[in-house]
Amino acid sequence: MKYDLTITPTPEKAEVSVTMREDHGADIYDITITSDEPVTGVKLSFHIPAGDIAGRWFPRMKMFDKGVHNSWEGATWTNFTGGAPLVSFYRSDDRNRLTAALSDCKAAWALNIGVDDRTKCLEFIAETKKVSISSESNKYTLSLFIDASTEGTSPDGSKLCDMTTMGARNERYWWESVRAASDFMASFCPSHRLPDFAFDPVFSSWYSFQRGIFADKVLEQCGMAYDLGCRTLILDDGWQTTPGVEDYSCAGDWTPNRDKFPDMKGFVDKVHAIGMRAMIWIGPGLCGDASKLSKLYGDKKIPGGWVLDPRFPEVRARMTEDVCRAAEKYGFDGLKIDFLDSFQGGDVRPENADGRDYLSLTDAVDDMARLISRRLSEISPDFLIEYRQNYTGPAIMANANMIRVGDCPQDYLTNRVGSIDLRLHTHAAVHSDMVQFNPDEPVEVSALQMVNILFCTPQVSVMFDQISEEQRQMLKFWLGFMSEKRELLQKSELMPHRCDANYSYVTARNDEEELHAMYSERLLMLDKPRKRVYIVNGVDRKPLYVGSNEKLTAHCRILDCTGREVKNETITIDCSPARVDVPMCGMAVIDLVI
C-alpha cells in the first residue's frame, strides 16, 4: 500500500481485508471487516510528512479556524445530521496537500486530524464506535479516499507513501480534490431530483416578519419581491402560532393559525397568481410542552430533549403526516425542513426499547427523512425540499434538493464562507442565509450582503416598502444578474482562492465567460481569459488593478452597485496592471477585442 494504513476493528479478532483502486483521481481503499460476532466499530489511521501545509478545510458551519491543529488536541465530530467525514489540507499555493474522506456518512466519526509534533507527520485518525448498520451484522464495508500531493519519508527514513505513479493529479487545487472527495462520498448515496427552479431567487418571511406574519401583509411583500426578481416565497415560522407567542412552547401543532391565515389554500393560490412558487417552514419532531402534540406523545420524547423520538413507529408516521399535509392539503410547492440536527441522543438497548422499532436514533431519522422525501416526490417529482447547515452530508442530503447556509443575519462574511463551503461538498442548489440590511445605511454598504453570496442562490428577507429606492434598485440589479448568470455562477467551475483568508477572491468560469469576485485582493492577473470577464469589487472604495502576461485590448464598462453605468472605455491590459476604478460593490464588464 502507498500509505501506512492501520485498521483496528471491534471486535479486535475480526478479519480485515483491504484492496486498493484508483478512482475520482485519488487512491480508494476498500475495507471489509468480517467476524464471528457483530462488527460494532472501527478505527483507522495513516500519516504523511507534514510539509508545506497552510491550513485545513472542514465542512462545518462557521469554521473560521483554518489552523492546521495538533492531532492530539481533541476530536472533530461528524454524524448523519452534522457535517461529513471529509477534511482537506492545502498548501500555500492553493494546491492540495492531503484530502481524505470516508464513504460511511451515517456513522458518528471522531476525527483526530493534524500534525503530530513527535513524528513531524500529518496524521489522519478516524474512529466510530457504532457503525451505521440498522441491525447488527458480522460484516462491515468502508471505503477510504486519499489524495496526497508528494512523496515523503518519516523521521526514521522509511518511505511513507509512494507517489511516483500518481502523475499530474498531485498538482490539482485543494478545492478540486475536495470536490472529487464529495463526488466519491455521494457515489454511495442515492441522488435527489434537482429542478432548475430550485436555483430561483427566494423571498423569505423570517427576518422581515419574524413570527408576526399575516396573509395579507405577506402577499403585499410578495408582489414587490416578484418585481425585484424573486420567484419563490418561503413562508417561515409563525404561520401556525398564536400572535404574541415568541418561543417554541407550542411547537408541534402544525395547523395554520386562523387569525393569521384564515384560508391557507387560498393564500397559496394568490402567491401562485403573483407568479411565485410557495414553500412553507416546518420543524418535524419539535414538541413544545404547551402543544396539543405533547399531550398525545409527550412520553415519546428523546430523553432530556424537546423533540419526539422517531424510533417509535407512530411518531415517524405522525411527523410524516404533519409534513406532507402542507403539500397535499394547501398546495405548497416545497418545504423548508428545520431542526433535523436536533435529533440527538444515545442508542437504546433491546430491553429498554419500550415500543421502539429502531434501537439506533440515526437509522430512525434516516428512515423518517426518506419516507418524507418519497411521499413528497409522489405529490410532485420536482417538489422542493430545503435543508440547512449543518445537516449537509450526502447520506441525509439524498432526501433534499436545496441546502441553505445556517442563520447569520447581516453577517456577509459567514454567508460567503458558508455558501462556498456548501458549493464544494454538496450536490444540491446552495442557498444563502436570508439577506437583510439596515434601510438607513448607504446602498453600497447594503450591497455587501449581495456581492458576498454571488456563487449561490440568493434568499432575501427585507420589507421592500421600507427600504430606499436605491436599495430596491440594487436588489433588482443583483437578483437579476445572479438569476441570468446562474449557469456561470452556480453550475460552472468554481475556484475559491485563499481559504486561509476566508476566500479572499473567488472565480467562476465556463467556456465563454469568467467572473472574479475580489473580497480582499486588489490585484487580478488574468490567465488565458475568456471572451468576457466580470470583476466585482467586494472590498471598498479603493481601485482594483488588472494585469496579464500577454497584451490584451478590451472594452470596459464600469457599473455601480445598482447596475448604473458610470464609465465606458477601451483599456490595455498587460504585465503593467491597469487601474480599474470599480465602485464599492460595483462591477467591471470587460469584453476582449479579438
Please place each PLM-identified region on the residue numbering.
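N-terminal accessory beta-strand-rich subdomains and adjacent acidic, glycine-rich linkers
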Residues: 1-185, 189, 415, 548, ...
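Active-site-proximal substrate-binding groove within the catalytic cores of carbohydrate-active enzymes
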Residues: 147, 152, 156, 368-584
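Active-site-adjacent "subsite" loops/lids of carbohydrate-active enzymes
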Residues: 198-200, 207-211, 269, 277-330, ...
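Catalytic domains of carbohydrate-active enzymes, especially glycoside hydrolases
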Residues: 217-241, 329-333
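The substrate-binding groove and active-site-proximal loops of carbohydrate-active enzymes
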Residues: 200-216, 248-262, 302-320, 350-365
